């Protein structure tokens, strides 16, 4: 009870200062947002793969002057990505023109082990938890799956209401580690972008040891990409989320541009949504036949991400398609 009262007396900020990746980016953005007319939102496939400096210079060479910021955050999913873009664009840059958005339209799961982390608790207001519930309940998964998914959001919502993170800060550090501070310094210098360079990363080592599996996955994706898509409507929850993202961006006075990065995921939700008129503009790169340079082994950091060299190529391609 005392914890809940504390939250009423001293409400938590919309985006607190202790959520790694999100807080440093948000703080920098708030201080500099009116310098930018273009924003990128998404997961690590934005954070580690879109270089604002390269995108801006390529666009300028083609005759369109832009100044962009990379608001990508590793491990973002569909629901929290939507919550973040809504919060950031509540008070948009005065010259905002374009907003790029990337996500995977997943089932809406919030990992249980994240329930007592600042990153999960901060955004689980009752309003945002209600949005998550609508996304889950209007999905096509089974009733049992919906129940499990709902629980995954109710826990951090309850913890937030109880101010668990604030009362037990001894176990949830409110300061970034030296390693996190160093990483934040890198992406702050690079307008939000950070290359993947850790050769000792488990993901990197796994990729190096299983390249045959990667090549097989690329071949499978090539076959999927070359097959005509059936004219099947995307699920109601996915339409709802895309409509909300579109509404938020347009309300901020910008044009929404959706991105399908060069991943290995077989889902074609963004393409289906574009074909069915749910989204207006899509820049799609998940096709090894059309973009072999983005799927070569020597251009990947791991199976799911480009290395720094390929990120430059991808940023150039994105800008070239943007200015067309």
Identify the meaning behind each predicted range.
Residues 70-72, 260, 286:
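Residue-level recognition of beta-strand->loop/alpha-helix junctions
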Residues 41, 45-136:
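Membrane-embedded segments
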Residues 242-256:
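A structural motif corresponding to the C-terminal end of an alpha-helix
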Residues 268-324:
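C-terminal regions of proteins
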């Amino acid at each position: 009870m005392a914890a809940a009262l504390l939250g009423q007396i001293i409400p938590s900020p919309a985006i607190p200062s202790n959520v790694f990746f999100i807080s440093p980016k948000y703080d920098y953005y708030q201080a500099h947002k009116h310098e930018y007319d273009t924003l990128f939102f998404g997961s690590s496939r934005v954070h580690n793969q879109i270089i604002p400096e390269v995108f801006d210079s390529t666009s300028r060479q083609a005759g369109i002057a832009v100044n962009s910021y990379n608001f990508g955050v590793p491990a973002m999913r569909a629901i929290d990505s939507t919550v973040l873009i809504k919060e950031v664009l509540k008070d948009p840059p005065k010259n905002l023109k374009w907003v790029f958005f990337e996500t995977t339209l997943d089932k809406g799961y919030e990992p249980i082990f994240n329930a007592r982390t600042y990153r999960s608790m901060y955004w689980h207001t009752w309003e945002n938890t209600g949005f998550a519930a609508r996304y889950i309940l209007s999905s096509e998964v089974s009733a049992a799956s919906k129940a499990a998914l709902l629980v995954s959001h109710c826990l951090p919502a309850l913890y937030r209401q109880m101010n668990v993170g604030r009362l037990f800060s001894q176990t949830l550090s409110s300061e970034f580690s030296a390693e996190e501070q160093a990483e934040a310094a890198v992406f702050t210098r690079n307008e939000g972008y950070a290359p993947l360079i850790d050769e000792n990363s488990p993901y990197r080592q796994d990729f190096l040891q299983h390249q045959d599996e990667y090549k097989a996955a690329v071949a499978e994706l090539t076959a999927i990409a070359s097959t005509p898509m059936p004219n099947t409507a995307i699920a109601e929850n996915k339409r709802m989320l895309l409509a909300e993202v579109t509404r938020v961006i347009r309300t901020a006075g910008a044009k929404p541009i959706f991105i399908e990065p060069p991943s290995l995921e077989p889902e074609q939700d963004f393409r289906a949504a574009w074909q069915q008129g749910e989204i207006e503009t899509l820049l799609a790169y998940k096709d090894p036949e059309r973009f072999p340079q983005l799927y070569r082994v020597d251009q990947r950091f791991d199976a799911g991400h480009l290395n720094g060299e390929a990120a430059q190529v991808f940023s150039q391609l994105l800008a070239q398609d943007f200015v067309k």
